[in-house]
């Protein structure tokens, strides 16, 4: 888990972890030098339960480096990523682990990535979309090849479980990796790994003011909103293309071609 000024939600997330039906795990936390009560809350849980490994970073590392540092620091058979503001349903770890172990029996020694859908909620955990995959046009079967995976994200970090063979492939990583979950997914696809999507959503994916900040102000000015939207879309696509380029994706023209093609295929599937 990577944390930063998460006092409002982190207690609820931690509680959901300790209510899991599968309890054989250790929680590693990197805190990005929070200046609220986040660390105090974490230490309270650590005192009660004892299986939390907390490290406080120098500020400003960012999500990519925080999560990758956590992955590198931990030593286990399997690894999951956790956001500070979500809530895990009680069977999340058990269900994901069961799928991982089943796939390992079929393909021993292979890099494996198991991931699930999510239930999108508002800040009070009222479900606004029962399927993140549906609302974000995610088609796991279509996104199983580099051509499409290079233009559209597939696995969300907080739903993922990876095994040790896949962890070994994840390092080293460049700054252009952009997002830890996208980097690991692309590594799995391009290095002979196996993707195991589970459609059953086992997480409440909270959307709140901190991750939609500024949207209402932009809507007050249509032109400003449109310009900001276009700028964001262009900037994000440049980042995604740079990420895909680490895997010899090809030209910018190819990227645009498969970007458009994916949306046409998704609309008619």
Region roles according to the model:
Residues 135, 140, 204-247:
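Catalytic core of nucleotide-sugar-dependent glycosyltransferases
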Residues 242-269:
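Membrane-interface aromatic/basic loop that binds lipid-linked glycans or pyrophosphate carriers
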């Amino acid at each position: 888990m990577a944390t930063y000024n998460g006092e409002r939600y982190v207690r609820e997330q931690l509680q959901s972890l300790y209510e899991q039906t599968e309890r054989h795990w250790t929680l590693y936390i990197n805190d990005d030098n929070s200046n609220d009560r986040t660390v105090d809350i974490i230490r309270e849980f650590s005192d009660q339960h004892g299986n939390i490994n907390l490290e406080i970073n120098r500020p400003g590392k960012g999500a990519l480096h925080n999560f990758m540092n956590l992955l590198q620091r931990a030593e286990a058979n399997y690894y999951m990523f956790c956001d500070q503001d979500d809530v895990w349903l009680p069977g999340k770890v058990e269900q994901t682990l069961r799928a991982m172990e089943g796939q390992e029996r079929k393909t021993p020694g292979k890099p494996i990535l198991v991931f699930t859908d999510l239930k999108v909620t508002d800040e009070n955990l009222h479900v606004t979309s029962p399927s993140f995959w549906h609302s974000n046009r995610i088609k796991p079967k279509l996104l199983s090849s580099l051509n499409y995976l290079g233009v559209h994200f597939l696995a969300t970090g907080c739903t993922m479980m990876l095994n040790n063979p896949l962890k070994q492939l994840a390092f080293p990583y460049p700054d252009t990796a952009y997002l830890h979950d996208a980097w690991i997914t692309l590594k799995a696809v391009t290095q002979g790994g196996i993707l195991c999507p589970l459609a059953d959503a086992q997480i409440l994916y909270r959307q709140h003011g901190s991750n939609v900040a500024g949207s209402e102000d932009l809507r007050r000015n249509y032109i400003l909103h449109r310009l900001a939207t276009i700028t964001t879309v262009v900037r994000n696509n440049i980042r995604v293309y740079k990420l895909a380029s680490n895997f010899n994706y090809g030209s910018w023209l190819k990227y645009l071609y498969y970007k458009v093609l994916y949306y046409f295929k998704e609309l008619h599937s």
